[in-house]
């Protein structure tokens, strides 16, 4: 109902007001790019949820948490279909889900509320803002985050110790989805380690997942490359490939 839905909206919009004050009124710079502005506003919903939960108000906290999880679920069902850095207002629900998942990951690894403050109180924007606040390159952040989205808690990796950068340190996403009665929607496409072709068209800062299975105890060498239509040279700038060996 309205009384349950509106409080997260108020927290979200209040962060936009804070952000506007910090950038436009205090620092005399333009507003933040859409994707990062929305990510920070969704992070504000999280902060209120955490404060409510600390007071024992679990039902009220869940009202804040569930909307971010619903958007995240839409994104994780097809992470190759939405851009993290989409800039067409107001942004799709899938893009908002990606943005919340990304800022949640960053805050868990790079300073929590101090990171959120640094991203808000600055003259930098977008990718430059994130890389300056974290001290990491954009490519490395995307690579680590993309692995964490699937690998953290994956049943296929039971018993495997992951590097911390491949995990969420501040939320168990799979448990949260289960708590609200939903299965974790992200799963890689299984592929046998032999000649294969994977075709897709991906927007910027999006990803697809493949799980390669090698036969026997001594798998053959793996050679991967990007190609355009009918094997023509790949023309798009900046393709990125991340490999996680699970056995």
List each model region and its residues.
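Zinc-dependent metallopeptidase catalytic helix centered on the HExxH motif
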Residues: 1-67
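Arginine residue identity/basic-tract feature
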Residues: 4, 23, 27-28, 53-55, ...
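Glutamate identity and glutamate-enriched acidic tracts
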Residues: 13, 32, 38, 45, ...
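An almost-null, non-specific background feature
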Residues: 15, 19, 23-28, 45, ...
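A broad "ordered helical/assembly scaffold" signature
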Residues: 17, 50, 72, 191, ...
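Active-site-proximal alpha-helical
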Residues: 73-151
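Beta/coil-rich, acidic/histidine-enriched accessory regions frequently appended to metallopeptidases
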Residues: 125-247
